[in-house]
Amino acid sequence: DRIEPTNWFVGMKNPQVQLMVYGKDVRAAEVSTDYPGVRIDSLVRLDSPNYLLVYMNVKDAKPGTMNLLFRAGKSKTNVKYELKARDMKGEDHMGFTNADVLYMLMPDRFASSGKNLKVKGLNAYTVNRKEPSLRHGGDLEGIRQHLDYFNELGVTALWFTPVLENNSPDHGKSSTYHGYATTDYYRVDPRFGSNNDYRQLVSDAHKKGLKVVMDMIFNHCGFEHPWVKDMPTKDWFNTPEWL
C-alpha cells in the first residue's frame, strides 16, 4: 500500500536506506532487486503482519527507478522505487540565527487563494470562517501572493505551523486546521496545495530574501495515521493506553 520514504537519493554520506513497507501480510515477504549498485542488507519483521523494514545499501547506485520484488509463497509483487540524484544546492543554505526576525503563521488562517476550498478524497471537513476551530481556507498560494508584505514588515524568515497532511475528520466544531495531527509525513495537505506548491513558495521566498522554517512534528501523529490504526510494534507509542 505504501513505502516510506516515498523515494531516496544517491550520493548521500550514509549509503544505507531504511524502507518501511506497509501492506497486507507483507511481513512474510522476502525482498530482492536486480538494480545495479543496490544491495538488500537485511529485513526486520515487526509485530504487525502488515509492516516490513527493508535495509538497503545504495552506495554504488546511479539515479533511476528500481524494481523491488516481494515474494511470499507463490505470490510475487513488483514495486517500483525511485532513487533520485542528490541536489547539492542545499549545502549553501543557512538556517535561521539570532539575527533573523521570524514571522510565525498558520497557513489556514493567513490568506486564501480560493483554489483549495473543497478538496475531494479526504475525511469530512468544513470550511467556515465564522467558527474559530474549523478550517478557514488559507493555503500556500495565498501566502505566496503576499510575500511582499513580509518584506515590507522587515521580517527575514517565515515559520509556518505544519503543512503536512492532517486527514482527520472534523469533530463537531473542532478540526485539525493547526496542522499538529499529521497523517502523512511525505505529503503536503492538499487543502494547502501540493508538494510542488510548497517548493515553489520556498523558492519564491528565497528570491525575496526570506528564509522558510519547516515545522515537523515527530513525537506524535494524528489518529488517522496508519501507525495508530495498525501499530507496527506493540511499543510503537509510549502511551498506547491513550489510543
Question: Whereabouts are the PLM-identified features?
Answer:
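Extended acidic/polar, glycine-enriched regions
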Residues: 45-95
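Low-complexity, Pro/Ser/Thr- and charge-rich linker/hinge segments at domain boundaries
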Residues: 2, 83-104, 109
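Non-cytosolic beta-sheet module surface loops
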Residues: 22-25, 58-60, 72, 162
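Substrate-binding/active-site clefts of carbohydrate-active enzymes
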Residues: 111-243
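Short beta-strand/loop motifs in extracellular/secreted proteins, especially
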Residues: 27-31, 66
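Beta-strand/beta-sandwich contexts
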Residues: 1-27, 85-86
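Short, solvent-exposed loop/linker segments at beta-strand-coil boundaries, enriched for Pro/Gly
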Residues: 34-42
